[in-house]
Amino acid sequence: MELIIISGRSGSGKSVALRALEDVGYYCVDNLPLPLIPELAGFLSNSGRSAVVSLDIRNIPENPESIEALLEQLSKLTIQTKIIFLDCERNTLIRRYSDTRRLHPLSNKDLSLESAIDLENTLLEPLYQQANYIIDTTNISSHELAENLRGILRGSTDKALKIVFESFGFKYGLPADADYVFDVRFLPNPHWNPELRPMTGLEQPVIDFLERQTEVHNFIYQTRNYLEMWLPMLEKNNRSYLTIAIGCTGGKHRSVFIAEQLAKYFQSRDKDVQIRHRSLEKHHKKIS
């Protein structure tokens, strides 16, 4: 369990950082008032949870001693605390504010953008000096920032990409959440066997029928090879889920069997796998 404090200049990417850490399992709180942070840390210590708190110029007092007192108070707790500071070059911050046309948080002090950035830099100096990690976001994308954060905290939590295999029937429409869709309607169809028609791809007679088909074996082999080739790149792309949809006409036989086979294969490779049969779920709801 640990408390991660994200701070840094306005416009340096703190919102991106919070979303990235939320995706890897942290409980995230944006702009928690400074006096409440020790209370949150105490709660986390008792509950065994980890959390991320963002501190920016809106909830940081102008007195540097307040920040030092907070850090000293946190050091007395059993929970581990880390500070990640996001920095960025002044000219890049000016350009980002110009592009988004947003107001700097200190603009309400009747300061120009440049003066607001400089004042903020002074006020954040105590956190900058105490930071465990400093990330310069001047020349990196939001995906690269997220990957840097994941790399820093990998020893604490490394949430694997969850691969969802789902079968569906084309006659019910394409699943909206699919990243990849594979059409297996060209494969031999158990539907035309009167004995197999009322069954599903989860039942042994249908499994036996499909396992005898060379085309089915070839499709499974080539599909899993394709996925294995690109999975490393997908895992590095800051994803939480990868949804792979397998579709046949009714979503009852071929797609169910193939989704099951692919799921079992990737489970055997220690991947985090979930399986879902959309059309079977619809059919079950109609019956019940």
Swiss-Prot record:
GO terms for molecular function: ATP binding; GTP binding. The keyword Hydrolase does not apply. ATP binds at residues 8-15. GTP binds at residues 56-59. Keywords: ATP-binding, GTP-binding, Nucleotide-binding. HAMAP family: RapZ_like (MF_00636). Belongs to the RapZ-like family. Displays ATPase and GTPase activities. This is Nucleotide-binding protein APP7_0339. It comes from Actinobacillus pleuropneumoniae serotype 7 (strain AP76).
